[in-house]
Amino acid sequence: MAALPFHPLLGILIAILILSGTILFGQEVLKRLDQKKSVLVSLALGMVLISQALYICSLDKIMFTILYPTAWCLMLLGAWYNFSYLRIVVPKCYTWRNGILNIIQDPVYSFSILLMFGFILLSFSPPTNADALNYHWGIPVYLLRNHEWPSTGLWLHGSLGGIGEIYNTLGVSLYAENLGTILQSLSLILFSC
């Protein structure tokens, strides 16, 4: 894989925009199904639908022509989602100030928020374990280089790649290699809230 053409923090920003675009896509699907729009459900539904569609397309090599446009569209949807979300949230920041002061006074809440913040910061770091480097990054890099699925004998555990690796391929295609890690940490934090 080629050297990054920009600072690694830009890759983290791209990953956050792709995740935001996935949330917006999931919210639109939920709206069409007349369901309540939850951030966690929208993120999960958007990730599964996008990844499953790309996984099916990858079996016939169609995915490799639509991968980059899909990643760019998700990034632009994420920028739109964040822009519209910030227009709603910023005026409410003054009312949140009192709630934040109450949370700071309770040590259990303060400790849990500190742990969540640390977990998010940890997800921004590069992966170091063999499973992430060999398998979760290896399959997306192999897909992008060879435009086909690797044989199962190439990987540490002989596992077949799934929709998680397809979603990581979206991130790796735009140099947002921490997309899967940030998705996992946000999901754990949203489940705990």
Can you say where each PLM-predicted feature lies in the sequence?
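Basic, ligand-binding patches in group-transfer machinery
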Residues: 102
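Cytoplasmic-side transmembrane-helix entry/capping segments in multi-pass membrane proteins
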Residues: 41, 105-108
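Active-site lumenal/periplasmic loops and adjacent helix-entry segments of GT-C-fold
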Residues: 117-193
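Membrane-embedded helix bundles of polyisoprenyl
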Residues: 43-51, 111-115, 183-193
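Transmembrane signal-anchor helices characteristic of membrane glycosylation enzymes that use polyprenol
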Residues: 77-83, 107-130
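Membrane-embedded, hydrophobic transmembrane alpha-helices
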Residues: 1-99
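Short, flexible segments with low predicted structural confidence
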Residues: 1-2, 111-112, 138-139
